[in-house]
Amino acid sequence: ELEFRAWLQEDPKQIIEIPKKLNSNYELINSEKELDKIIKLASKSKVIAIDTETTGLDYMDAELVGVSLSYEAGKAFYIPFGHEKQEIPQLKEKIVMSKLKPFLEKAKNKIIGQNIKFDRNILTRYGINIDSIKNDTMMMSYVLDASATRHNLDALSSYYLNYKTSTFEDVAGKGVKQVTFDKVPLELATDYAAEDADITLRLYETLEPKLNDIKPLKKLIEEIEIPLIEVLSDMEQNGTQLNSKILASQSKDLESRIKKLEKSAYKIAGEEFNLGSTKQLREIFFEKLNYRVIKKTPGGQPSTDEKVLQELAEEYELPKVLLEHRTLSKLKSTYTDKLPGQISTNTGKVHTSFHQAVTTTGRLSSSDPNLQNIPIRTE
């Protein structure tokens, strides 16, 4: 069901069976004394799992609501400071940051996380610089099986720990009724946030022996993938400079060229029509202009897909005009119109998200915006 193809071939007996209800102890930390105590205990540990809870997924805009820690499987702590209208008291953000900063910055080669690049980006904005990351369970899973389709915490917990984690919807609601995490009651938030850190630590303890048994993969994650997390994190935060004035000028030029192509298409067809309508294209191509039918759709209708247009463009002018119209419209809607709207008001730059654990080949991908898909220059 989870489509973990290679993993399914493993001996089922090797999968750790844990009851649906984990043996766990999750605590809310809302006093300086308690915070000092867990920091002291965590500092003595060889591995510290961390997780941040925020108001959103945009690492340049989301507000930090709380931080969870786990240094022993089954034991985790949630330190909230940004929840709204709570009867249970919280520590002030300034106090939490002042104590976590020296603790986390000194914990070199100890800190692990699940997609820890996001946590690193968030914490950097709050003045905490995490370097020398020990590991990332998402990347451990990816290195073990790059062909698996999911490396998120819920999927890994289900597969490796036989445990179904709480989902964001469980605590924040669904659809239009869903709230941001700062509005989630602290009782629910504590179990959810602490569980994330606890499960991350449990996964690390499960995946580490598997990687240790395969030396090339262990070397890959230690020497390339984990160091790359910090490089990509820095790249994301630095952002990419865009000249919105040039983009606006290009958008205006594209709009003019698109309108000229539309007029040209109308003239060739002998009537105005919707260039994006498959039905109208079919009528004009095959009923009015009698173009030859190259192939048909599963429904038996003459096809007007991209390959058909390219072949018809070798014989007729209208398909050639339509292909150029589509190319320019794509450039305008995807790039010259959209990119300026993705420029951060805080930095004046575009901040993409790079993904290490997506492609089976190991290459990077990016999103919001996809800066690896900018088209090459055309004539």
Q: Which sequence ranges carry the predicted segments?
A:
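Conserved "right-hand" nucleotidyltransferase catalytic core of DNA-directed polymerases
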Residues: E1-E84, E105, T124, N135, ...
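Short, basic/hydrophobic alpha-helical segments
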Residues: Q90-K108
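Short helix-interrupting loop/turn segments at helix-coil junctions
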Residues: Q114, Y163-S166
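Helix-loop-beta element that forms the nucleotide-linked donor phosphate-binding surface
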Residues: Y126-I130
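Long, compositionally biased intrinsically disordered terminal regions
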Residues: M139-V143
